[in-house]
């Protein structure tokens, strides 16, 4: 009888641990691997879509975006998690902003994350549509960062199980 109680207790602990690991709707993403082919396309489309502003790709801003990518992935994961824990999300966003502030080293720049659901292919049209949809948020983000006349950008892209994240860093 004592062995049976111990076995039941061990099984119960195992079941509880398994339930905790699978409780959230979005599993933690794999390490943020860059999709360099899509990244090149997004950079080209961004230059084409921003030709009126003479946008150019800047390798230094792309490097900043790359260094911020892992924390940006964690922020999107926290936002998409179910049930959502606002403390985890706010901590992830704060960490993303801290890494960004450290990496930009005083440059005036804005971090602009854009994510697409996994069923949505990232194309020039979907990128333009996302910008049109998020235009007010993007403008507000740029202005808060002090970027009033964007001319340079960097971009990294990662495909996760639940989404594709396009992470822009925009500067004057």
Residue ranges of model-derived segments:
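Bacterial N-terminal signal peptides that target proteins for export
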Residues: 1-11
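A well-ordered secondary-structure block
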Residues: 91-172
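C-terminal motif of bacterial Sec signal peptides marking the signal peptidase cleavage site
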Residues: 19-23
């Amino acid at each position: 009888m004592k062995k049976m109680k111990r076995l039941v207790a061990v099984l119960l602990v195992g079941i509880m641990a398994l339930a905790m690991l699978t409780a959230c709707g979005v599993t933690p993403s794999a390490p943020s691997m860059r999709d360099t082919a899509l990244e090149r396309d997004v950079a080209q489309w961004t230059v084409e879509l921003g030709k009126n502003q003479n946008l150019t790709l800047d390798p230094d801003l792309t490097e900043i975006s790359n260094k911020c990518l892992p924390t940006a992935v964690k922020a999107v994961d926290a936002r998409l998690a179910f049930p959502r824990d606002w403390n985890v999300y706010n901590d992830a966003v704060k960490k993303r902003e801290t890494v960004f502030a450290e990496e930009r080293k005083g440059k005036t720049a804005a971090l602009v994350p854009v994510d697409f659901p996994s069923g949505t292919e990232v194309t020039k049209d979907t990128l333009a549509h996302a910008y049109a949809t998020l235009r007010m948020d993007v403008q507000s983000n740029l202005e808060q960062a002090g970027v009033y006349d964007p001319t340079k950008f960097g971009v990294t892209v990662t495909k996760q199980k639940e989404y594709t994240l396009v992470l822009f860093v925009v500067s004057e």
